[in-house]
């Protein structure tokens, strides 16, 4: 099945859609993703990137040529990129300059909202090209099961019981989101015996 087929009947003009893939192997992307700035990061582009499109569909590259669906965004206007108006710990890439970049208004829609972090596509061999036309067909690799009982909230809130940790480790397919997010950053995790307090 092609990704575009999932949005059949939604009256989308694919000629005016851009597909983007953020590769977590890039340090600045991993850093912004960890800090919750992925949407902010993708809003900063060169003047022409999203000028002639109505929608941007975002994916996260976590391994190989895959793309994990993040959301569909309507494209609004743009304003100048001014670094000092961004969070201090935001990490711009080398192409983001105040002379060449703008900040696009990207409004997240509810299209496929229930598929965030679950729908996985094959981006194809052209992974170096992070932005492609919406008419470029993408094969759906998998739709992961929805798991709500153990949801990942943020990196500074990873506090799991041994039973929960065991469930995640031995059910990787169901808890793929945990594997992706924890492997995206370097970290040391402390295991503590709740009875003795020993680490």
Q: Model-flagged regions — what are they?
A:
Residues 1-197:
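GIY-YIG nuclease catalytic motif and its immediate N-terminal context
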């Amino acid at each position: 099945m092609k990704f575009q087929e999932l949005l059949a009947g939604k009256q989308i003009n694919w000629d005016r859609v851009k597909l983007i893939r953020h590769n977590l192997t890039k340090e600045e992307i991993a850093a912004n993703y960890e800090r919750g700035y992925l949407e902010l990061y993708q809003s900063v582009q060169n003047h022409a990137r999203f000028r002639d499109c109505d929608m941007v569909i975002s994916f996260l590259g976590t391994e190989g040529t895959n793309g994990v669906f993040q959301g569909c965004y309507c494209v609004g206007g743009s304003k100048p990129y001014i670094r000092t108006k961004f969070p201090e710990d935001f990490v711009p890439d080398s192409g983001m300059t105040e002379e060449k970049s703008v900040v696009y208004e990207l409004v997240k829609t509810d299209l496929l909202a229930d598929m965030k972090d679950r729908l996985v596509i094959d981006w194809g061999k052209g992974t170096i090209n992070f932005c492609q036309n919406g008419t470029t067909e993408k094969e759906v690799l998998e739709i992961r099961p929805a798991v709500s009982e153990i949801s990942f909230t943020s990196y500074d809130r990873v506090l799991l019981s041994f039973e929960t940790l065991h469930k995640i480790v031995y059910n990787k397919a169901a808890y793929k989101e945990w594997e992706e997010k924890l492997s995206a950053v370097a970290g040391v995790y402390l295991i503590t015996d709740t009875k003795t307090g020993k680490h």
